């Protein structure tokens, strides 16, 4: 049978092992993803320490919130980085653009380790920290699109899914690297020293990873597809207007976001970060144990990025990604409920035998998910009751009470009326403070009697089943994420590929995915049900499933050398 030809008139090569040059391309491109997730896990793991170092002029609660907002700033600006660096990548080339992105990203991480604290330079410290986070977010906005485009344009026909899927595996490497450095430094110098200044070391040692990344990327050549296009004088002079100003391309960008990356992102974050937060915040599993179980699930699951990437070269990208979204929609609720039974059986039993309800006048109940509200802002009887339950991760059902009535908490067959708080000079007055303290004590005692545990009991935990359930969540991640880079690359023409694929990827992963933990826990806090946060990823994944199935075509046989 005659060999098929690409748009260059070159026969598609027969299957062969990966060459040393291709291995170098994948390795160099993947280092940026390692850097991205190394920093991500560092900042997330050290958020409490960073809050004390850079936001110490605020009260403890507000400091932690602003530390998380600084964290979120990096996500929010990623789409803008996609526009800036995507444009450069389509105009001057992939190689030098994603060399610039890793320099900015790496130096931003390194400088955090040098940044003086609030105690030293005052308000300049948090301002500079947020600026560094935004710089890094901008660079990250150009990094993934560059890496995916570069690897795909170096990949032989029939191997793009397999080759680009290696980029996704490095997120796990970033996690393990950050855990190794944090644990090593913390154990080596002790908790007190680590909290004082030792936390800087994990940020500072990132300069070594940056040095290796830059050295390797400098030795790479430009992608064949871009070289061909440049030689023919077909590079885009205005990739932004071509990508987003022409409906035929803008339509594909919108479809890529709604029908691919939004669902991929929420499945990704649900399977790793939300699962971790659910274990620690809702199921009260010790943080070290939870991290180790997540790490075990990732270790088992990571090879499946390549498995599904390779499989997508044979059966297509679309069916695998859509199947991952479908399985997420169908299995999230039962899997997370099984997690409760496996990781904290005492809690599962208490919820089944002594459910908690809050009966209150809905008009007196505030939104419990407000991240900047102070304790005194929750002063109604309803707010005081729900606030205590939310802070102690106790699920409850809402029952509408009579207008003007005080809130009543029912635990099994016990009922406790919540007081109303009276605020004087920005604090609860003495009488209110005593009543609130007595209410909290009564609720705590009744919860204990009803069997609600203060924390998960390691002796009763089914660790094997917990890891298997977490592995299932990671497996769904590999299904939606393994083939995604190849599919995004194949959806857009070479001349505007970097720009066009970067924006939907980073809106999906920066906004829909990056803000998932905050959004999901706000839903939990507002509704009182520990599982209701799952509605956010389920709805988004469901929308992606419908739009992707109906409106996105298969791309595995697309000729990426075509410029039309």
Residue spans for each PLM region:
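Hydrophobic core of transmembrane alpha-helices in multi-pass small-molecule transporters
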Residues: 115, 121-141, 346-361, 460-479
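Low-complexity, proline/glycine-enriched hydrophobic segments characteristic of transmembrane helices
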Residues: 337-468
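Multi-pass alpha-helical transporter architecture, strongest
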Residues: 213-220, 335-342, 540-564
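C-terminal ends and interior cores of transmembrane alpha-helices
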Residues: 56, 103-122, 327-349, 449-457
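Glycine-rich segments within core transmembrane alpha-helices of 12-TM secondary carriers
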Residues: 139, 161-186, 209, 335, ...
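Extracytoplasmic gate region of multi-pass secondary transporters
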Residues: 43-44, 249-297, 335-336, 363-399, ...
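Central cavity-lining transmembrane alpha-helices of secondary-active solute carriers
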Residues: 68-87, 106-108, 173, 295-308
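Extracellular/periplasmic helix-loop-helix junction of adjacent transmembrane segments
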Residues: 47-78
């Amino acid at each position: 049978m005659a060999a098929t030809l690409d748009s260059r008139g070159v026969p598609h090569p027969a299957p062969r092992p990966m060459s040393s040059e291709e291995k170098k391309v994948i390795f160099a491109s993947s280092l940026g993803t390692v850097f991205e997730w190394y920093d991500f896990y560092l900042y997330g793991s050290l958020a409490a320490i960073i809050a004390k170092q850079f936001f110490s002029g605020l009260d403890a609660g507000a400091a932690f919130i602003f530390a998380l907002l600084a964290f979120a700033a990096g996500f929010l600006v990623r789409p803008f980085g996609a526009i800036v660096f995507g444009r450069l990548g389509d105009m001057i080339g992939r190689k030098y653009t994603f060399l610039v992105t890793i320099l900015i990203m790496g130096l931003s991480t390194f400088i955090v380790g040098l940044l003086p604290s609030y105690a030293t330079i005052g308000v300049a410290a948090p301002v500079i920290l947020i600026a560094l986070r935004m710089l890094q977010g901008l660079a990250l906005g150009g990094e993934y699109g560059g890496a995916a485009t570069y690897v795909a344009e170096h990949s032989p026909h029939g191997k793009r899914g397999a080759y680009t899927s290696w980029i996704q595996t490095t997120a796990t490497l970033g996690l393990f690297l950050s855990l190794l450095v944090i644990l090593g430094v913390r154990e080596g110098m002790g908790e007190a020293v680590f909290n004082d200044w030792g936390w800087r070391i994990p940020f500072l040692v990132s300069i070594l990873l940056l040095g290796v990344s830059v050295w390797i990327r400098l030795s790479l050549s430009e992608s064949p597809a871009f070289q061909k296009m440049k030689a023919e004088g077909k590079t885009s002079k205005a990739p932004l207007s071509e990508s987003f100003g022409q409906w035929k391309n803008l339509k594909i960008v919108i479809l890529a976001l709604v029908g691919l990356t939004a669902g991929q992102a929420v499945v990704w974050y649900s399977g790793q970060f939300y699962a971790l937060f659910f274990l620690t915040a809702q199921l009260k599993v010790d943080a070290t144990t939870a991290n180790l179980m997540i790490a075990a699930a990732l270790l088992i699951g990571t090879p499946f990025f390549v498995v599904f990437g390779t499989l997508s070269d044979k059966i297509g990208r679309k069916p695998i990604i859509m199947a991952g979204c479908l399985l997420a929609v169908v299995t999230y609720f039962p899997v997370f409920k099984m997690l409760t039974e496996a990781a904290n059986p005492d809690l599962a039993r208490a919820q089944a035998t002594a459910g908690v309800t809050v009966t209150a006048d809905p008009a007196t109940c505030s939104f419990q998910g407000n991240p900047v509200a102070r304790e005194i802002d929750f002063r109604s009887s309803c707010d005081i009751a729900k606030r205590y339950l939310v802070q102690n991760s106790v699920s409850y059902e809402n029952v509408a009470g009579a207008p003007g009535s005080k809130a009543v908490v029912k635990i099994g067959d016990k009922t406790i009326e919540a007081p109303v708080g009276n605020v004087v000079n920005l604090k609860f007055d003495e009488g209110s403070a005593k009543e609130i303290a007595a209410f909290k004590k009564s609720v705590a005692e009744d919860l204990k009697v009803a069997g609600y545990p203060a924390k998960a009991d390691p002796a009763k935990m089914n660790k094997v089943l917990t890891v298997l359930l977490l592995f299932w969540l990671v497996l769904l991640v590999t299904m939606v994420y393994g083939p995604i880079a190849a599919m995004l690359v194949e959806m857009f023409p070479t001349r505007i590929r970097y720009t066009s694929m970067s924006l939907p990827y980073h809106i999906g992963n920066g906004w829909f995915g990056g803000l998932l933990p905050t959004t999901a826990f706000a839903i939990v806090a507002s509704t009182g049900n520990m599982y209701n946060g799952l509605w956010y990823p389920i709805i988004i994944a469901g929308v992606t499933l419908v739009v992707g199935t109906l409106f996105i075509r298969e791309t595995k046989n697309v000729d990426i050398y075509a410029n039309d």
